């Protein structure tokens, strides 16, 4: 990518396909890659629950979710009980997935893990109905991803 907010082209995504995963959501339910097949999705990595930038981003996505019409999976390295508590405090209409153990394994497989902080980086993936990653965006630490990126890719997928 040439800058922090520019999506990669669909011809040159960062990953060819979304890696396999099996993660618990805020309700303790297992969510797998196979659950996504047949419909497009956004996989949204974020560093931590209960933090202002992450909360603001996810609140913005929650407000836009009905218009986007695409499944959203928000992924952090927080443990599932933390995500459950955050959901009670700030409910959102999508899965909050715990990439806790092996710690950040899914984020690492998606090149969305910060080895220094031990948390996910601000990376989002646009995934088509076949599981192919069509686009990727990453923003700097503390910088929210633009909602327009999701709106554009919702139209393209």
Regions found by a protein language model. Give the residues of each.
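Chalcogenol-based redox active-site neighborhoods
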Residues: 1-157
